[in-house]
């Protein structure tokens, strides 16, 4: 086994069930921290600090930093880190189940202030974790995440492209999305089998296309993109009649990727006002996109 693919880094063995790949390329680390641009006095939260590749250089620039770490061994290492321990608040918990709203509200943020979230996210939880965080968009200033490059392409996609999908719409509904930099597998130990990229998500201060209930935005995008090869006349036939779609200015021959976020918001708001008599999807919409 080559050193690059070794699962052991700085004395810690990467755990597959936690999706651990440890960042070690100093140039990449410098570029990510520069993009985050942490300042003293800001509320900074890192998800999945791991062995501290981002934690250490960020903590050099600030006095306080909160981290959420599920791996008990890594949390213990951070508690005994000679430089970090007095600066860190360590939350040893699964970020997917953590009540971020309760924590954010405990910070007593001032008007216009928000939490700055960042992390090298385990790729096996990155999408559901972002969906979890979108629920607290009103309390977040920005987010910087290392993700699979393919996921970043989907986050940043425009209509009429193959990458455009439900993830695109839900992310851009809540946030302005900007790619920051691409990262090769060699920047990690063990090296992942895919390319990575860093993305910046900045929650809109005012939602550009607000919906009355985000459930219906989830609902209509799930149904449309689960059948993305079908025309919308057919894909959405259990939710809308052809006449209703036309009244909402939807081309019956369009496909899911042809509609804008504004189009989907219009459909979602119509469904809120005119819900189907039977909605057998209510319990099965999830975040597997």
Swiss-Prot record:
Biological role stated in the UniProt entry = Specifically dimethylates two adjacent adenosines (A1518 and A1519) in the loop of a conserved hairpin near the 3'-end of 16S rRNA in the 30S particle. May play a critical role in biogenesis of 30S subunits.
Q: Can you state which reaction this protein catalyses?
A: adenosine(1518)/adenosine(1519) in 16S rRNA + 4 S-adenosyl-L-methionine = N(6)-dimethyladenosine(1518)/N(6)-dimethyladenosine(1519) in 16S rRNA + 4 S-adenosyl-L-homocysteine + 4 H(+)
Q: Which Gene3D superfamilies does the record cross-reference, listed alphabetically? A: Ribosomal RNA adenine dimethylase-like, domain 2, Vaccinia Virus protein VP39
List the source organism: Actinobacillus pleuropneumoniae serotype 7 (strain AP76)
Give the enzyme's main class according to its UniProt record, as a single word: transferase
Tell me which family the UniProt entry assigns to this protein: Belongs to the class I-like SAM-binding methyltransferase superfamily. rRNA adenine N(6)-methyltransferase family. RsmA subfamily.
The UniProt entry lists the main location of this chain as cytoplasm
Does the entry feature the keyword Mitochondrion, yes or no? no
Amino-acid positions noted as binding S-adenosyl-L-methionine in the UniProt annotation, renumbered to this chain: 21, 23, 48, 69, 94, 120
Query: What EC number is given for this enzyme?
Result: 2.1.1.182
What CDD domains would the database entry show? AdoMet_MTases (cd02440)
> What's this protein's name?
Ribosomal RNA small subunit methyltransferase A
Among the Pfam families in the record, one is RrnaAD
Q: Which domain of life is it from?
A: Bacteria
Q: Name one GO cellular component term.
A: cytosol
Write out the GO MF terms.
Answer: 16S rRNA (adenine(1518)-N(6)/adenine(1519)-N(6))-dimethyltransferase activity; RNA binding
Task: Write out the entry's keywords from A to Z.
Answer: Cytoplasm, Methyltransferase, RNA-binding, rRNA processing, S-adenosyl-L-methionine, Transferase
Instruction: State the encoding gene.
Output: rsmA
Q: Where in the cell is it found?
A: Cytoplasm
């Amino acid at each position: 086994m080559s050193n690059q693919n070794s699962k052991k880094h700085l004395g810690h063995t990467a755990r597959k069930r936690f999706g651990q790949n440890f960042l070690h390329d100093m140039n990449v680390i410098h570029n990510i921290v520069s993009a985050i641009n942490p300042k003293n006095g800001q509320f900074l939260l890192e998800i999945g600090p791991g062995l501290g590749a981002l934690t250490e250089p960020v903590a050099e620039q600030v006095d306080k930093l909160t981290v959420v770490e599920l791996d008990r061994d890594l949390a213990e290492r951070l508690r005994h880190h000679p430089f970090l321990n007095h600066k860190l608040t360590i939350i040893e918990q699964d970020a997917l189940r953590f009540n971020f709203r309760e924590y954010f509200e405990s910070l007593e943020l001032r008007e216009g202030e928000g939490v700055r979230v960042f992390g090298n996210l385990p790729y096996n939880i990155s999408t559901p974790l972002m969906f979890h965080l979108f629920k607290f968009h009103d309390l977040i200033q920005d987010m910087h995440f290392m993700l699979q490059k393919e996921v970043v392409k989907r986050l940043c996609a425009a209509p009429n492209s193959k990458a455009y999908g439900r993830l695109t719409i839900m992310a851009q509904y809540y946030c302005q999305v900007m790619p920051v930099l691409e990262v090769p597998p060699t920047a990690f130990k063990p090296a992942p089998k895919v390319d990575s990229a860093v993305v910046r998500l900045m929650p809109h201060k005012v939602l550009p296309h607000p919906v009355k209930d985000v459930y219906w935005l989830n609902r209509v995008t799930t149904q449309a993109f689960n059948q993305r090869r079908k025309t919308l006349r057919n894909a959405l036939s259990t939710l809308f009649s052809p006449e209703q779609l036309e009244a909402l200015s939807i081309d019956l021959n369009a496909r899911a990727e042809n509609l804008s976020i504004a189009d989907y918001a219009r459909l979602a708001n119509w469904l809120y006002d005119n819900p189907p008599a039977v909605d057998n999807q209510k319990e099965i919409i999830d975040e597997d996109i």
